[in-house]
């Protein structure tokens, strides 16, 4: 039986023998494509070639690609663990042709590999072909069908509809028919009962798709019409885990050697056995799948967070923790302990797991601990909600309450449902779903972009000349209109550009496009599928005219200084803190720089000072830039250049050197370190577990900051009568202020006690109710303290109502004893209505509520209104 490693290697070896160049997996986290957060298919790293933005270096390519599918079109997350074949992170084996071979070779080689190399039984294989689409004017893919007929009987060739057998990159872009290969893994007796043909694409767990051959031959335009692609593309993808299942004779991906070591480790940790309990098995599969996703995301530079891709990873991690907590009794952090098992299983194929082991473990552990605390908070809130619901005589909590738990506190709906079932209660799912849809719609509206078709003026690709020039004559290749948030913008592609497109943490250049007719402002430059896009607010009236592309040199110079400073900072951090320092992110703007790096504790003030001294010493040394442009990657490594985890490098790279600082980098830099001027670190903080962040200024911004500091010191000296030692004067002031504050607090306590005693002596008893009312210029906190003290002493029939002035703002406070609440009075309802008299509003709990307002003259009337509403 072939192992997973042998299967992966056999695929690469087979296609290498067919003239394919084997490329490494791209990072799972995507950084230069605004339409995607994660690599969700093998073709993602080739999008710029498929879209025609760059020529293909190799016309035949194959690889094994790390993929992640959790959102959008490929949303498999909620199915993961519940069936035998869906995953979040998976490997995609694929082969591509860019303008070389097409359907015939793709089908022939797929058959040869599956049947002749892997020895799969051909009688168990089925192929689907596109049946055509009359409304699109597309006929059946008879060409693909004719090639399959060489290998398969006609009843094993199945027509598929547009949904299953016409692949599209998105709403616009390359597309075409596809042919899926399915395998029937059922035992013979099951195959005798019903044909596999009838189960293809019907979600049968043992009749599954293993390979999809996509024949890209069209381009979908913004108006929905299709046009032929200039160069046809073959894009195939085969699910590695499913292939392992088929070859190893298993009925579940999780029964293969891809997952079994992890499942056994989880079972041992939980004191159970895989295969004994359905719900526990689901939990173990969820964890076994999700630990891979989380670990690989962290190695590729994406940490869990509350935004965008980071939020997706946090969600996946929390889903795994929740299943462990609910079904496996894992009440403490546990997932980080599984990393050695993952490394044993996949470390050879993906050595980045080994290199990043310490960081991955720490991030996962801290995320687990934080979410376990959240779960405890959520359970307490749910307990209160259940109590309030039962007190109202109901057994169903509102969907809005459940959504608040989910959205604000990260408390999952299915866990809410589980706890409710245990207490004989339910949740209004329709209300919950309505709240969820409203939130999704708000997010869609915020992110919605309308993109027009590209208008092509001339063919060609973009040459970047920005390392050598800040002005360059250029012509527009193509442009399109986009609309976002009620703003119309234009994206312009030039044949040559000195504009640096945002990447590697450095923001894009701004500037102008100048022709003999007009000047167009470039407000940003982005990179989309490796293509520099110039963003403008208006389109040139004469787009075919040649123009000078002129970069804003002041902003460019400031960016260059900050970018070079990050390199010096990285080098200095390694020298001061240790060689474990690895860059985890950066942001370089004209105003400042931000640098994220792996480190497991706070950087001390003394260490920051040492780092600053080292960086500024190199700046004063005026070290010249040494640039190695377009050199082989192996040569770069021999130079000692530092590569970033999660970045994909080509075979030829650019290296930037300032003395001992040597890094792979495609950004803009100063000619010599002296141009930076000076570096001043302005903050150091934690970003995530094991990741610290430094923010700093350079050059003129340091000067501005020093001016501000000097102005502040001068002002303080003036305030302290030009004391010779400002530090001593401030400390003395703080000590004196603390003493005075203590005196005020003591006075307020005495006043509070005195007022309470007076109120007790002046209780009015009306219809058996002990009414305490007053109006005084007191802080809200003092009134609250008095109210709770009185409630502790008068346990029945207490009706407390007070008007107060807190910093000139009128406040109304009501406190009721429990028996009055039980009798139907609600403090919140009383203050809500009475607050109108002080032009305000408020609320609170049934026994205690407050309201604030604007009209101080209405306080006494508001007090009387409370009594009137209560019927007193």
From Swiss-Prot:
<dbReference type="InterPro" id="IPR009000">
    <property type="entry name" value="Transl_B-barrel_sf"/>
</dbReference>
<dbReference type="Pfam" id="PF02272">
    <property type="entry name" value="DHHA1"/>
</dbReference>
<comment type="function">
    <text>Catalyzes the attachment of alanine to tRNA(Ala) in a two-step reaction: alanine is first activated by ATP to form Ala-AMP and then transferred to the acceptor end of tRNA(Ala). Also edits incorrectly charged Ser-tRNA(Ala) and Gly-tRNA(Ala) via its editing domain.</text>
</comment>
<comment type="similarity">
    <text>Belongs to the class-II aminoacyl-tRNA synthetase family.</text>
</comment>
<dbReference type="InterPro" id="IPR023033">
    <property type="entry name" value="Ala_tRNA_ligase_euk/bac"/>
</dbReference>
<dbReference type="GO" id="GO:0004813">
    <property type="term" value="F:alanine-tRNA ligase activity"/>
</dbReference>
<dbReference type="InterPro" id="IPR050058">
    <property type="entry name" value="Ala-tRNA_ligase"/>
</dbReference>
<keyword id="KW-0648">Protein biosynthesis</keyword>
<dbReference type="GO" id="GO:0002161">
    <property type="term" value="F:aminoacyl-tRNA deacylase activity"/>
</dbReference>
<dbReference type="GO" id="GO:0000049">
    <property type="term" value="F:tRNA binding"/>
</dbReference>
<dbReference type="GO" id="GO:0005737">
    <property type="term" value="C:cytoplasm"/>
</dbReference>
<feature type="binding site">
    <location>
        <position position="665"/>
    </location>
    <ligand>
        <name>Zn(2+)</name>
    </ligand>
</feature>
<feature type="binding site">
    <location>
        <position position="567"/>
    </location>
    <ligand>
        <name>Zn(2+)</name>
    </ligand>
</feature>
<keyword id="KW-0030">Aminoacyl-tRNA synthetase</keyword>
<dbReference type="InterPro" id="IPR018165">
    <property type="entry name" value="Ala-tRNA-synth_IIc_core"/>
</dbReference>
<keyword id="KW-0479">Metal-binding</keyword>
<feature type="binding site">
    <location>
        <position position="669"/>
    </location>
    <ligand>
        <name>Zn(2+)</name>
    </ligand>
</feature>
<keyword id="KW-0963">Cytoplasm</keyword>
<keyword id="KW-0820">tRNA-binding</keyword>
<dbReference type="InterPro" id="IPR018163">
    <property type="entry name" value="Thr/Ala-tRNA-synth_IIc_edit"/>
</dbReference>
<keyword id="KW-0067">ATP-binding</keyword>
<dbReference type="GO" id="GO:0008270">
    <property type="term" value="F:zinc ion binding"/>
</dbReference>
<dbReference type="InterPro" id="IPR018162">
    <property type="entry name" value="Ala-tRNA-ligase_IIc_anticod-bd"/>
</dbReference>
<keyword id="KW-0436">Ligase</keyword>
<keyword id="KW-0547">Nucleotide-binding</keyword>
<protein>
    <recommendedName>
        <fullName>Alanine--tRNA ligase</fullName>
        <ecNumber>6.1.1.7</ecNumber>
    </recommendedName>
</protein>
<keyword id="KW-0694">RNA-binding</keyword>
<dbReference type="Pfam" id="PF01411">
    <property type="entry name" value="tRNA-synt_2c"/>
</dbReference>
<feature type="binding site">
    <location>
        <position position="563"/>
    </location>
    <ligand>
        <name>Zn(2+)</name>
    </ligand>
</feature>
<keyword id="KW-0862">Zinc</keyword>
<dbReference type="GO" id="GO:0005524">
    <property type="term" value="F:ATP binding"/>
</dbReference>
<dbReference type="GO" id="GO:0006419">
    <property type="term" value="P:alanyl-tRNA aminoacylation"/>
</dbReference>
<dbReference type="InterPro" id="IPR002318">
    <property type="entry name" value="Ala-tRNA-lgiase_IIc"/>
</dbReference>
<dbReference type="InterPro" id="IPR018164">
    <property type="entry name" value="Ala-tRNA-synth_IIc_N"/>
</dbReference>
<dbReference type="InterPro" id="IPR012947">
    <property type="entry name" value="tRNA_SAD"/>
</dbReference>
<dbReference type="InterPro" id="IPR045864">
    <property type="entry name" value="aa-tRNA-synth_II/BPL/LPL"/>
</dbReference>
<dbReference type="Pfam" id="PF07973">
    <property type="entry name" value="tRNA_SAD"/>
</dbReference>
<dbReference type="InterPro" id="IPR003156">
    <property type="entry name" value="DHHA1_dom"/>
</dbReference>
């Amino acid at each position: 039986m072939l192992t997973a490693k042998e299967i992966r290697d056999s695929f690469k070896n087979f296609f290498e023998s067919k003239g394919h160049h084997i490329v490494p997996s791209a990072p799972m986290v995507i950084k230069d494509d605004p339409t995607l957060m994660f690599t969700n298919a093998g073709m993602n790293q080739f999008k710029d070639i498929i879209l025609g933005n760059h020529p293909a270096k190799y016309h035949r390519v194959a690889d094994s690609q790390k993929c992640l599918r959790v959102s959008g079109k490929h949303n498999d997350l909620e199915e993961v663990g519940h069936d035998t074949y869906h995953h979040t992170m998976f490997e995609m084996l694929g082969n591509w042709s860019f303008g070389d071979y097409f359907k015939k070779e793709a089908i022939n080689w797929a058959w040869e590999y599956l049947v002749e190399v892997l020895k799969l039984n051909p009688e168990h294989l089925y192929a689907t072909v596109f049946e055509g689409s009359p409304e699109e004017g597309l006929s059946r893919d008879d060409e693909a069908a004719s090639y399959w007929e060489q290998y398969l009987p006609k009843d094993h060739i199945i027509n598929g509809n547009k949904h299953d057998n016409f692949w599209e990159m998105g709403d616009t872009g390359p597309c075409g028919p596809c042919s899926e290969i399915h395998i029937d893994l059922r035992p013979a007796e099951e195959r005798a009962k019903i044909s596999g043909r009838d189960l293809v694409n019907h979600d049968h767990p043992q009749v599954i798709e293993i390979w999809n051959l996509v024949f890209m031959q069209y381009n979908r335009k913004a108006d929905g019409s299709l046009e032929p692609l200039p160069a046809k593309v073959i894009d195939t993808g085969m699910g590695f885990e499913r292939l392992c299942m088929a070859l190893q004779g298993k009925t579940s991906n999780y029964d293969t050697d891809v997952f079994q070591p992890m499942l056994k480790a989880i079972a041992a940790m939980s004191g159970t056995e895989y295969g004994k309990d359905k719900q526990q098995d689901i939990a173990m599969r969820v964890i076994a799948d999700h630990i891979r996703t989380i670990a690989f995301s962290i190695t590729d530079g994406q940490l869990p967070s509350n935004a965008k891709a980071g939020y997706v990873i946090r969600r996946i991690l929390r889903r795994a923790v929740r299943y462990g907590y609910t079904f496996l009794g894992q009440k403490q952090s546990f997932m980080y302990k599984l990393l050695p098992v993952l490394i044993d299983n996949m470390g050879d194929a993906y050595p980045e797991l080994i290199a990043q082991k310490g960081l991955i473990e720490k991030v996962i552990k801290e995320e687990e601990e934080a979410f376990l605390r959240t779960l405890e908070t959520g359970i307490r809130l749910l307990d209160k909600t259940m109590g309030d619901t039962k007190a109202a005589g109901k057994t169903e909590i509102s969907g809005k309450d459940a959504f608040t738990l989910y959205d604000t506190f990260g408390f999952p709906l299915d866990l809410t449902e589980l706890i409710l079932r245990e207490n004989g209660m339910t949740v209004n799912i329709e209300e919950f779903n309505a709240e969820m849809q409203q939130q999704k719609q708000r997010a869609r509206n915020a992110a919605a972009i309308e993109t027009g078709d590209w208008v092509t003026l001339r063919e060609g690709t973009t040459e970047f000349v920005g390392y050598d020039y800040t002005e360059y004559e250029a012509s527009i290749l193509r442009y399109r209109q986009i609309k976002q948030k009620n703003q119309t913008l234009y994206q312009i592609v030039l044949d040559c550009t000195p504009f640096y497109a945002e990447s590697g943490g450095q923001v894009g250049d701004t500037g102008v496009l100048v022709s003999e007719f007009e000047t167009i402002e470039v407000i940003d430059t982005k990179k989309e599928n490796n293509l520099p896009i110039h963003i403008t607010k208006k389109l040139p009236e004469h787009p075919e005219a040649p123009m000078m592309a002129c970069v804003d040199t002041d902003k460019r110079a400031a960016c260059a200084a900050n970018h070079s400073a990050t390199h010096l900072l990285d080098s200095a951090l390694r020298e001061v803190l240790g060689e474990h320092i690895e860059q985890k992110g950066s942001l370089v703007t004209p105003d400042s720089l931000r640098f994220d790096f792996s480190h497991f504790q706070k950087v001390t003030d003394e260490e920051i000072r040492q780092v600053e001294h080292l960086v500024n010493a190199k700046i004063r040394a005026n070290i010249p830039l040494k640039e190695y442009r377009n050199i082989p990657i192996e040569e770069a490594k021999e130079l000692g250049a530092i590569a970033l985890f999660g970045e994909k490098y080509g075979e030829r790279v650019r290296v930037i050197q300032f003395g001992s600082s040597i890094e792979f980098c495609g950004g803009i830099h100063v000619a010599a370190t002296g141009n930076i001027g000076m570096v001043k670190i302005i903050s150091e903080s934690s970003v995530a577990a094991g990741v610290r962040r430094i923010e700093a200024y350079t050059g003129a911004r340091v000067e501005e900051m020093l001016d501000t500091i000097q102005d502040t010191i001068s002002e303080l000296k003036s305030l302290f009568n030009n004391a010779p030692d400002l530090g001593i004067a401030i400390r003395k002031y703080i000590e004196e202020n603390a003493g005075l504050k203590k005196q005020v607090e003591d006075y307020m306590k005495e006043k509070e006690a005195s007022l309470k005693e007076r109120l007790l002596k002046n209780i009015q008893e009306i219809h058996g109710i002990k009414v305490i009312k007053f109006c005084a210029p007191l802080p809200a906190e003092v009134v609250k303290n008095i109210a709770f003290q009185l409630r502790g002493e008068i346990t029945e029939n207490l009706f407390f109502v007070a008007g107060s002035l807190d910093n000139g703002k009128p406040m109304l406070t009501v406190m009721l004893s429990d028996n009055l609440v039980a009798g139907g009075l609600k403090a919140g309802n009383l203050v809500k209505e009475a607050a109108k008299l002080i032009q305000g509003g408020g609320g609170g709990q049934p026994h205690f509520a407050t309201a604030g307002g604007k009209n101080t003259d209405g306080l006494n009337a508001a007090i009387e209104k409370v009594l009137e509403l209560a019927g007193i």
